[in-house]
Amino acid sequence: MSKSTAEIRQAFLDFFHSKGHQVVASSSLVPHNDPTLLFTNAGMNQFKDVFLGLDKRNYSRATTSQRCVRAGGKHNDLENVGYTARHHTFFEMLGNFSFGDYFKHDAIQFAWELLTSEKWFALPKERLWVTVYESDDEAYEIWEKEVGIPRERIIRIGDNKGAPYASDNFWQMGDTGPCGPCTEIFYDHGDHIWGGPPGSPEEDGDRYIEIWNIVFMQFNRQADGTMEPLPKPSVDTGMGLERIAAVLQHVNSNYDIDLFRTLIQAVAKVTGATDLSNKSLRVIADHIRSCAFLIADGVMPSNENRGYVLRRIIRRAVRHGNMLGAKETFFYKLVGPLIDVMGSAGEDLKRQQAQVEQVLKTEEEQFARTLERGLALLDEELAKLSGDTLDGETAFRLYDTYGFPVDLTADVCRERNIKVDEAGFEAAMEEQRRRAREASGFGADYNAMIRVDSASEFKGYDHLELNGKVTALFVDGKAVDAINAGQDAVVVLDQTPFYAESGGQVGDKGELKGANFSFVVEDTQKYGQAIGHIGKLAAGSLKVGDAVQADVDEARRARIRLNHSATHLMHAALRQVLGTHVSQKGSLVNDKVLRFDFSHNEAMKPEEIRAVEDLVNAQIRRNLPIETNIMDLEAAKAKGAMALFGEKYDERVRVLSMGDFSTELCGGTHASRTGDIGLFRIISESGTAAGVRRIEAVTGEGAIATVHADSDRLSEVAHLLKGDSNNLADKVRSVLERTRQLEKELQQLKEQAAAQESANLSSKAIDVNGVKLLVSELSGVEPKMLRTMVDDLKNQLGSTIIVLATVAEGKVSLIAGVSKDVTDRVKAGELIGMVAQQVGGKGGGRPDMAQAGGTDAAALPAALASVKGWVSAKLQ
C-alpha cells in the first residue's frame, strides 16, 4: 500500500533527523525582513542569511517541509494552475541543508538512500536518472563510481541559457554572492508516456519528471564575474512534496494524489459539480491551499502587494465556482476539509480557522456583487471583437470597475482562444499609478541593504550608556574608513545600548560621542548580526577603530518601554474581551503612540473598547512584575507564550511575562512593573483590511495629555452652549433638535420656491413637431432641486422634452427629462450627453431622466442653444 502525502512528509523529516539534522518548522509565507521576496517560494528562504554569513544557528544541518507560494512577480504559476499536471500556487518543499558541514558526497548518498532504500521510499533504481553541471566531475564520479548509476543515465548539462554559468544545473542567488553547480534527480514514468530525458529535444514531456534538486554552494561570485571558492561550502536541496507523492502513489498528475483527490471531492460537494475531471475543480482545490495559508500568515485581501495577489487567487477561485454552477458562497467551506487533509502541517491553520473562513466569505460576497455584471460586460466586448486579442483598455476597465484581475479576464478569454493585450493593460495600470503618485505627493524611496561582516553585542536591556568601539562605517551603502563633520552615515559598534528596530518597536535615538566628535543617532537598525546607528556626524571626525561613548535618549526610551508593555497587556485584554481568535497582525511602538493590528471580523463596539481599556488599566493598578526568562522555543510555546506575527525566532527565546495576565515571546524593551505605565487610553479603532482591525493608544504622560485635552474641549463646548459639564448632553440634544426643525422648514421653503419657479417656466415651453420643448438656465437653484422641478414640469406639460441647468461654484449641473411617449425618438441619456460634452463633462441615465455635470460654465449658453436643433432633427 502506497504512503499518504502526510506519511511521505513525515518520512522525509524522520530520515534526515536520523542523519543528525535539526527539524525546523516551516517559516511564514510572508518572508521575514526580505524585501526582495513577495512570498516564501523555496525551502532555503528562511536560511538565506545563514548562507550569506549574516546569521548563525546552533545547528549545522537542518531539514524542513516549507510551505511555499508562487503566484506573483518573477515566480508566477497562477495562469497555468488547473491546466497542467504540476503547476500550483501553493506547494510544500521538502529540503535538507548543510551550513558548512557535509558536502557533495553525503548529500548525494543521503538522497539515494532515502529514494531507493526498502526502509524508506523504495523507488526502483533503474527508473532514476540524474543531471550534473557539465564541468562538475566530482558529482559525476560520485554518481557513477560510488552510487553505481550507469553512465547512460547521468547527463551533463552545460551553459544552456546563453551565458557562462547560465545553466539549469548552476544555481545563483543573485548577480553576486553564493552560487554553485547542482545535480537533479529525475524519475522515469515509463515509455507509455511521451517525453525524453533532460537535455533532449523532448525533455518537456511528462515521462521524465524532476523530483529533487541538490545545490552545491561552493563559490562566491564577484562583481566582475570571477568565482572564488567558499571557505565552507554548503548544501541546499529541494524536493516538491506533491511531485514525490505522485511518484510514490503511482500517478502521473499531482492532482491525482490522495491530498488533491480529497480536496477535489470536497470542492465538488460544496459547488454541486458532478464531473470530477472538470479543470475548475483542480483550480479551486489548489487555490484554497494558498489562500487559507496566506491569510493564516497575516496576508489580507487588498489592492496592493501581497494582498492583491491573494485577492486575485480568491477571485479566480470564485469565478471557477461560478462556472461549476455554485449558487452561493462556497470557498470558505473548504477550509475545514483542507485542515483535515493537511494533518500535523495544518495545526497553525486550525488555530485560525474561524478567522480564515470569515475573511474568505467576506471577500467572496464582495466579489459576487460585481462578478455577473463584469462577466456580462466581458461577454459584450468579446462578441464585438473582430480579431483574436482583447484590448488592454477593456481589461483595465474590468479591473478598475468590477475588480477583475487581469489573469481572471485572461482565463475567460483563453477558454475562447482569445488573447489579452497585457502590455496595454499594464500601460493603463501604470498611468493610474502615476496619477495616484502625483495625487499623494509621494515618490519612490529605496534603502539599499548594507552588508556588514562584523557582529554587535546588544547590552541595552541593562545599560543606556556604555563605551564601545567602531567596527565599521558606511556612507551611501559603501564601507568607508572615516567620516567627517556634516556627513550622513551608518556607524557599527562592537557593543551598544541602542535597540535596533524589531518586533514593531522603533530603533533608539541618541548620541555617539568622544572628546573631539559628536554623532547624532536618528535611528537604529539591524544589518544581519550587526547593529547600525544611522545619523549625522555633527562635529569632528570619526574613523574605524575609534572608541565612543554611546548614549541612548533615556526619556524617549522610557516612553517607548511603557508603550511596548501596554501593547502586551492590550493583546491579552483583546483576547479576553473578543475571543482567542484575536492574534497580532502587525504593530508599531514608538515614543508617542502604540499601534496594534489584530484579527477580528467587525468593528469593536464602544462597550468592547471600554472593556479592553478598563481591563488594561486594572492590570496597571495591580502593579504586576514584568519578568523575562530565556528558554527553548518549544518550551516557551508549551508554557503558553504567544509568538508574534512576522517575527523570526532563534531556538533560544526571550519570554516576557506580566504576572499571570500575559506571556509572550519578545525581544523588546519594557517597563519593570505594569504600574510604571500609569494610565492607558485607546484613541482610535478602525479597519485596515478584511478581517483586520487597528487600535491606536497612548500611555503615561501621553494618556494624561489626552484626558486634559478632552476636558478642555468639554469646557469649551459647555461655554459655547452656556451650560456646564453636568447638563451638556441635554444642551446638545436641544440644539440638534432645533437644528433639525430649522432644516425641515428650510427644505419646505425651497420646495415651494421650486414649485413656483416650475409654474413660471412652463409658459416658456415651445412647440417642436408637436412636442413641448423647455430649455432653461436657472440661477439660485440648488442642483438637487432640478430633478423635482423636471418631475413637476413633465406633469404640467404632457408630451415634453426638458433640459434644465444651474451653475454653482463654477460647476455646471444638468438634467434632462423626456415624457414616456417621446422616449422612442429622444432619449434623455443621449440628449444630456450631447449637452454635457460641450461643457467639459459627461453623464447618463434612463431614457426618461438623465443627469450630468460639467466644468466649463462659460460654454453653457451655447450648449443649451444647441438643444433645439438636436431635438428637431430627432423628431422629424
From Swiss-Prot:
Cofactor binding notes: Binds 1 zinc ion per subunit.
Asked if the record carries the keyword Ligase, the reply is yes
* Binding positions for Zn(2+) per the UniProt entry: 564, 568, 666, 670
Q: Which positions carry N6-acetyllysine?
A: 74
Q: Which cofactor does it need?
A: Zn(2+)
What PROSITE patterns has UniProt attached to this entry? AA_TRNA_LIGASE_II_ALA (PS50860)
Q: Name one GO cellular component term.
A: cytosol
Q: Does the keyword Protein biosynthesis apply?
A: yes
Q: Which GO terms fall under biological process for this protein?
A: alanyl-tRNA aminoacylation; negative regulation of DNA-templated transcription
The enzyme's E.C. designation: 6.1.1.7
Query: Which InterPro entries would you find in this protein's record?
Result: aa-tRNA-synth_II/BPL/LPL (IPR045864), Ala-tRNA-lgiase_IIc (IPR002318), Ala-tRNA-ligase_IIc_anticod-bd (IPR018162), Ala-tRNA-synth_IIc_core (IPR018165), Ala-tRNA-synth_IIc_N (IPR018164), Ala-tRNA_ligase (IPR050058), Ala_tRNA_ligase_euk/bac (IPR023033), DHHA1_dom (IPR003156)
Q: Which UniProt keywords apply?
A: Acetylation, Aminoacyl-tRNA synthetase, ATP-binding, Cytoplasm, Ligase, Metal-binding, Nucleotide-binding, Protein biosynthesis, RNA-binding, tRNA-binding, Zinc
Catalytic activity of the protein:
tRNA(Ala) + L-alanine + ATP = L-alanyl-tRNA(Ala) + AMP + diphosphate
Q: Which GO terms describe its molecular function?
A: alanine-tRNA ligase activity; aminoacyl-tRNA deacylase activity; ATP binding; tRNA binding; zinc ion binding
Location of this chain's protein in the cell = Cytoplasm
One of its Pfam families is DHHA1
Purpose = Catalyzes the attachment of alanine to tRNA(Ala) in a two-step reaction: alanine is first activated by ATP to form Ala-AMP and then transferred to the acceptor end of tRNA(Ala). Also edits incorrectly charged Ser-tRNA(Ala) and Gly-tRNA(Ala) via its editing domain.
Protein family membership: Belongs to the class-II aminoacyl-tRNA synthetase family.
| Subunit structure comment from the entry | Homotetramer.
Tell me the domain comment: Consists of three domains; the N-terminal catalytic domain, the editing domain and the C-terminal C-Ala domain. The editing domain removes incorrectly charged amino acids, while the C-Ala domain, along with tRNA(Ala), serves as a bridge to cooperatively bring together the editing and aminoacylation centers thus stimulating deacylation of misacylated tRNAs.
Full protein name: Alanine--tRNA ligase
Organism per entry: Shigella dysenteriae serotype 1 (strain Sd197)
Q: What is the lineage of its organism?
A: Bacteria, Pseudomonadati, Pseudomonadota, Gammaproteobacteria, Enterobacterales
Q: Which gene encodes it?
A: alaS
